[in-house]
Amino acid sequence: MRVMNFSAGPSNLPDEVLKEAQEHLYDYHGKGFSIMEVSHRGKVFEEVHFEAIKMAKELYGVNDDYEVLLMQGGASLQFAMIPMNLYMGGVCEFANTGVWTKKAIKEAEILGVNTKIVASSQESEFDHIPQFEFSDNADYAYICSNNTIYGTQYKCYPKTKSPLIIDASSDFFSKKIDFSNIAMLFGGVQKNAGISGLACAFVRKDMIERSKNKNIPSMLKYSIYAENDSLFNTPATFAIYMFNLEMKWLLNQGGLDKINEQNIQKAKILYDVIDESNGFYKGHAKKENRSLMNVSFNIAHDKNLEPVFVKEAEENGMIGLKGHKILGGIRASIYNSISIEKVQKLSEFMKNFAKKHA
């Protein structure tokens, strides 16, 4: 019997996806070889690769103004690749809402980028998304749409004439997005759309043009990925195969609007328990910025009970609930593949735990 996995990532995968991958791990569609053994230049893998890209575009409904790039190195490599490819010598603006924006700012500064932090919520332990405006003449404006550690999430994206770059690693493929204001949307796929080792980026073609004249290594150049359909070198073939299965699974669930409905319902179940606990539990994020993906909270009644909560949860078949080492506390990551039923079981455990220890 499989446990209920509330880990922040790599995270829970849908049972249907795991079972299909298990079958194809040994014999791919009766061909006598594993999907892990196929050449990235062969017809079998090319079908998997291009189908994955097609489904990703279909899910978000993006037009041909965007290239879908599949790259190794996860989202963290993008912290360096973005300034390498898109910095034009002006200023790059950031909204600092957590660890991942801080890392993106640091990488840009290592590369000599003129950075400007237009807003930050660091003084309150990143418990909210601050109010701010980007200028309209930055080389790019940068946000992280969902902050995994602190449990905050943008409910709408800032409007700006500057190219808007969004790190969506932890709410990737969790809802429909209006791309009209977005120059680049990227993320590691290991939370909502696959396994670790792969980053997916939707990059507007005018941003691809910027990279063409950049004197940077080929493997770090967006235009090289675009010109070669993300097949310039041997890609992460198994991770792309898993990404393909996840895209198919999302479409079979009814697409991103349906997934978003379920995500809203799941988050409400847990936040209701927190809010109705008479102060036993306390959420970290301000209510207006609460994440649908990561529910971070403390046992305000007695923080010494938090390791007891995690231990007893594991004994009840629920893992991955220990908060990040930076923030501590408890965190339930309820990504796309976590069912409403599993969230309900966690909520019942939370209620019973509070009743027992109040």
From Swiss-Prot:
GO terms for biological process, alphabetical: L-serine biosynthetic process; pyridoxine biosynthetic process
Cofactor: pyridoxal 5'-phosphate
Protein residues bound to L-glutamate: 41
Residues that coordinate or bind pyridoxal 5'-phosphate: 75-76, 100, 148, 167, 190, 233-234
Signal sequence annotation: none
GO cellular component, one term: cytoplasm
Residues found modified as N6-(pyridoxal phosphate)lysine: 191
Family (UniProt): Belongs to the class-V pyridoxal-phosphate-dependent aminotransferase family. SerC subfamily.
Protein name (Swiss-Prot/TrEMBL): Phosphoserine aminotransferase
Source taxonomy: Bacteria, Pseudomonadati, Campylobacterota, Epsilonproteobacteria, Campylobacterales
